[in-house]
Amino acid sequence: MTMQAIGKPHSRVDGRAKVTGGARYAAEFNQPDQLYAVVVGSTVGLGRILRIDAGAVAQMPGVRAVISHLNAPRLAYQPHKGGTDPANGERLHVLQDDQVRFYGQPVAVIVADSLDHAERAAAALAVSYAGETPVVDPLDAKVQPVAPQAGRAGADRSRGDADAAFAAAPVTVEASFDMARENHTPMEPHATIAAWSGDRLTLWSKSQFVVNEQAEIAAIFGMPAANVQVICPFVGGGFGTSLRTWPHVTLAAIAARQVGRPVKLVLTRRQMFHTTGHRPRTLQRVALGATTDGRLTSLIHEGSGETSRYEQFVEALTSTSGFMYSCPNVRTRYRLLPMDTGTPTFMRGPGEASGMYAVESAIDELSYKLGIDPVELRRRNEPAIDEAEKLPFSSRSLMQCYALGAERFGWASRDPRPRAMRDGRLLIGWGVASASYPCFFSPASARVRLLADGSAEVEAASSDMGPGTYTSMTQVAAETLSLPLDKVRFSLGRSDFPATPSHGGSQTMSSVGSAVRAACLAVQAELAKRAVADRRSQLFGASIDSVEWREGRLSRKGDAAAGPSYSELVTGAGGSPVEAGASAARDAAIAKQYSMHAFGAVFVEVSVDPDLGLVRLRRAVGAYGAGRIVNPKLATSQCIGGMVGGLGMALMERTALDPRDGRPVNAHMGDYLVPVNLDVPHLEAHFVEEQDPHVNPLGVKGLGEVALVGMAPAIANAVFHATGKRVRELPIRIENLLDV
Amino acid sequence: MPEETSHIPPAAAAFPPVSRREVLQATAGAVALAALPGGAADSAAAAEAGAAAGHSLRITVNGHAHELAIDPRQSILDVLRERLNLTGTKKGCNQGACGACTILLNGQRVNACLTLAAMHDGAEITTIEGVAQGEALHPLQAAFIEHDGFQCGYCTGGQIMSGLGCIAEGHAGSPAEIKAWMSGNICRCGAYPGIVAAIAQANKAVRS
Amino acid sequence: MIPFTLQKVLTEAEAIAAAGQGGRYIAGGTTLIDLMREEVERPEKLVDINALPIKHIRAEGGDLVIGALARMSEVAAHPETQRLQPLIAETLVEGASPQLRNVASIGGNLLQRCRCPFFRMLDAGCNKRAPGTGCSAIEGLNGGHAILGTSDQCAATHPSDLAVALIALDATMRVTGPGYERSFPVDELFRLPGTTPHLEHTLRPGELIAEIRVPGGPHARRARYLKVRDRSSYEFAVVSAAAALHVEGGIVRDARIACGGVGTRPWRMRAVERALIGKAPDRAAFEAAARQATEGVKPLSGNHYKVELLPRTIVRALEMAGEVA
């Protein structure tokens, strides 16, 4: 039997748990004697707390504690910077002073014996403030843009003389874009159950990065990391909002310590819009210069994004502009707009999604100006190498993506003229855009145990917010060990498992997958070492180099006879599980040799009702060059999910802030619109064959981000094709299209 | 008083009751106003002392009878999750705006978050935990796995309960109909095409 | 949510007596429980009226008669609704979600509170929730707010789709009070905000909606509802229009039009109706008539687009109605 676990469309190994209600999320680990905590958020957008009338509330039924800066413990807040924390600035220190930095900032937490009692008390708590007017609008003249202090992603870059080339170009496009703030809005609200046992703390907590949450909470409380355990086997959607450890986790731990009992704290849906990050609103300007035959001579991309006063959130807003197109003169500039808001955070396709919305829209504008098909325009400017880094791509299949996508979509039959395609009274538009996202590979580790029954247990901290980590890691282990899938049990979501990087940035498959593979090879090596040293083994005395694993059996090289199985070897060695751990990391030399990215091409069809301003997506085809596809079924779901996310970005999602106090006005799932079932038409995801030996040992590139990135500009471009009107803000809504 | 009131959210203006309100002058000339959400903690405290007694509730969940004393404020969702430890029914928004809490209440799909348990004494409730027959998955559950009608899984219980309702109501006749009648269940991961395919398949299986 | 007591009643008399002692009726509760959780609503006593025998749906003569406790889903699916008043069925299905429609009652639908976000946020001024605290929307974000029937105190739209259809169809309602019954047009249920935006309807204390009656007529079959919104479903109307036409001999004899999403109450478009009478039912006539809809509009900073969208929505709804075979 030859095992082929990788590349097969296996159903999710955790599918049964999820369809029977058996998968347990953070808030579902109810503890004995558990109390309930509810956060009270600031009702001013800037200022100082004057008074908290805790006394009246403390007397209310069931209330066990009212904790604010007045009585909260002074916490250590030792320095800590996880990979998902901004490099510059200092995180919010919750309940440590009387300052209000943004609307909704936690100012108190109530603990009570029931959720109803806690909610009632939270609503009744009187807090008075010295309020000031916050600055929350990026267009406000009081906003002082700053250059990001550090980090390559935020640095201004330039090659050639883009401004001179733009001035000299025979054909130019110059346009500005405004993309709304978005909130991740996962289905599962942030939740933490905190339980202290002496000086040890256990947190059942929604997290995409359990080892960082462990380290951060340990730093905040000034305790050894080994005394903090974070558990999170399932994440009910994250999209980035659970990458950082937000203040509510600390609040839950404070509350549990204060009352001496386990405490459950779940944010309300409204609070999900206050303190758990958001995709920053961005303002961008793109200027393109081209020859009349469509060769780019200048690409200028300037952008700015919201950040808080206390941290610099930097995302990859302009980073793709250096390598997507062949162009001798490129200049990018990125600024941050510090305002009185909570710190933004990574949201699916962070930076790339916003930045490529602007650039891919501008390229589309250029295609009309030139009279060149937008796919052809991209082909004419396809670079041979990464011209920003002056490195070859480890692989780049963008043109193959365009070819495949165009064929599946039927792009050739497009009438290029705006407003030329119709269906009855509806205007039909076809649009296209490129997508790209880097191939990250961060150090990761994993552990494998082979049991006497011949099965394997595999562990890594990691997370599975939906892409299918449980399944794909099971496949990697099964393939590496030549075991059937049901002989492998993969566990994740515990901070005492081997450390892994954040479950974000499309790096789980590459990083954790490589670690799982390495650990499987390590446990095989360990078992082989034992076998050749074991007098009872038929392989006793063989040199370690003379044996090899073939389909889960250890044999002498060249000996066709099947050797002992895992079960026989483990049993023969006494029956105790044989365990090995291993780590994986990118070879630093490789990173200096290649530019590594996933690419995609997205084709969409929209209809626009010109009378009513209604845009509806009618179909979409995405083609992706994302390296090896470990599980086509799950990869397809991941891409379709990304397209749906991009649909939301294009046509619905917008967190609106009240300029007077910075409150998110539509902090409600009925008002912050995301696509519903009826909004989603037939969507196709296709993968081009791509073998990339450089990105990581598995040859995978990651899909989560690139799947979303091209969707919004493709839709915006299709809206132009349908209507002849270029809307340069997202989301595009009814009110934008009543004049078409 | 040299107040600049224009920047104050009208919000803070005339409530809570004046007796609880403070108007203070901050050092830099900024205006301070108290905002007491809800107000009237004093009268509420008195009322709550009297309401501590609790309400007796008998419900049948997935065929099992339960009798328990509840706070009349508790939704069926909170009773399931916090009292009966049946956590397959999810709290997504607690506002009737997402569908993650969908259960069958006396055979009909409803949002458990907007349903006061105390108003449903004697009710028969089916949650996602009660759909499979022992080890045997319901055809709709199996179809969700087959068509990968989920990613993170948090909306899935609600989707399946809603899908069962959709099929029972006769609204699963075509993909278009399923989409319209499943639009009360948000899936942020965007697994809608798989959800539609799963319900269409199960509808055929159930009706054949 | 503040604590409350719950009383289940079995008769209308019992219900009215309980209301007389300060009770607040609850049927489906999809609005009330939501707002109680936000502490926007703070009833101390709930009167559960779900056991009252007013769940009927039937034809009486040519009228469709609907008990106030009939559920949205039941009314939408009922053969008599589909036979006599397909507009009611269509309108109901466009509202909320299947789960909510299984629970929400017809009476409660008419009395649902507004969706203005400031109404729901206790730390925002709102004259409707807390009279005298100012309106946060009029000088703030108001893209979803009303352009008709506003005052300087409130601009929240009425969210019900059903009410739009009922007003277009000249439905009446019967209410039961302490020792009496009275009937009146549904149109008279809704108040304008004026200086008292917290008073939304004309029911007297303790009155219970018993029944809705939708008169039949030649217009009833040629009737459609159009709900314009950015999301295809599960969203309140940006603008909506119910349109019913009686066309005979190629001429509009009767027209009933009402709109949602634009008014502080469901808005009957009588001037548009008048402009249609005697005209051929074509797009030109519809467009000319629909121009009447925006007379007297008072757009706010963020909702000028509704002035443009309103007549277009009416035109499309009329076209849809005109296409009904």
Q: Over which residues does each language-model region extend?
A:
Chain A
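Conserved beta-alpha junction segments in alpha/beta enzyme cores
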Residues: A162-F221, G305, E315, G429-S455, ...
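Flexible, low-hydrophobicity surface segments
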Residues: M1-G151, T172-A175, H248, Q258
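Short acidic, glycine/serine/threonine-rich loops at helix termini
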Residues: A76-K81, A121-A124, Q214-E216, F239-T245, ...
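C-terminal catalytic domains of large/alpha subunits in multi-subunit enzymes
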Residues: Q59-M60, H69-L70, G222-N227, R257-V263, ...
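Extended active-site and interfacial segments that coordinate phosphate-rich ligands
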Residues: V13-A17, A123-V136, Q208, A215, ...
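Conserved beta-strand/loop scaffold segments within soluble protein domains that form the structured core
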Residues: E213, C232-F234, F239-N329
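Short Pro/Gly-enriched beta-strand edge/turn motifs at strand-loop
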Residues: H80-G82, A167-E182, L265-M272, R425-S434, ...
